[in-house]
Amino acid sequence: MEFIDSLTGTKSRLQKTFRRFDQIFDQLLDEHINQKRETKEHKDLVDVLLHIQESGSDEIPLTKDNIKAIILDMFAAGTDTTWIALDWGMTELIINPKVMERAQAEVRNIVGDRSVVLESDLAQLQYLKAVIKEIFRLHPPNPLLLPRESMEDVSIDGYDIPAKTRFFVNAWAIGRDPESWENPDLFEPERFMGSTIDFKGQHFELTPFGAGRRMCPAIIFGTASVELVLAQLLHSFDWELPPNTTPKDLDMAEVFGITMHRIADLIVIAKPRFP
């Protein structure tokens, strides 16, 4: 109830957070409006949205608040799913130290003495990309993809599906299907080395971001974020479990929902490599 939120201070905190986000988005939009971006290479999503707004399209009318809402959706969705992927990824690497050693060796060989991993380094980190594919296969942040609706009557494998049927795609189950994957319950990034399988919507055995025109619009942002952060964690730190703790002690139970978190927090010791 609203009066309870007022008494507890929840309403005022939400309003303060909203105003803070609104100021950030105003600043972001002003920066894009005030600076000239004449070349296509330097245009980003905000530039495209502002161009649509300026063109005054009747098909896609956009207000400033609409653009802010789209930006918020991109960041909010990407932040939660990125954190989930990193949490599961670090857990699997702690449980599988040989995989971590190989991934660390690759990252440190490419990055060298630099303390910061650059986005330009990512294209050379092929084993790290395989690790991330394996993370998404076993632990898709969104276990059930957004619902779809059949446009017409169709028959698939003996099942008659009428038009207007709402259905869900279980990405979690597909990633563990023994008909598609050998040893599906094992964390083995090597399965993707030399393989053309990717998660960009062309291979239906691996669809953590969906497929088709309605696939996740933040796939590039999301994957780049996971790659960059995971590479930095592996490059900058050596990782180990606390004393008297073994990989078998880690609780791999999941909280099923719109996104799939681990029930237990991951507690590890980070040893910095750089002063």
Language-model features and meaning:
Residues 17, 21, 25, 55-108, ...:
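Central I-helix of cytochrome P450 enzymes
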Residues 195-226, 251-256:
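Cytochrome P450 heme-thiolate "Cys pocket" and heme-binding signature region
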Residues 1-16:
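Alpha-helical membrane-targeting segments
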Residues 97, 219-259:
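Cytochrome P450 heme-binding "Cys pocket" and the immediately downstream C-terminal segment
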Residues 51, 258-275:
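C-terminal helix/juxtamembrane-tail motif
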Residues 151-153, 169-197:
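Conserved cytochrome P450 K-helix/beta-meander segment immediately N-terminal to the heme-binding cysteine loop
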Residues 23, 97, 117-158, 178:
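Conserved cytochrome P450 K-helix E-x-x-R motif and the immediately C-terminal K′/meander segment
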Residues 13-86, 114-121, 125, 129, ...:
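Conserved cytochrome P450 catalytic core segment spanning the I/J/K helices
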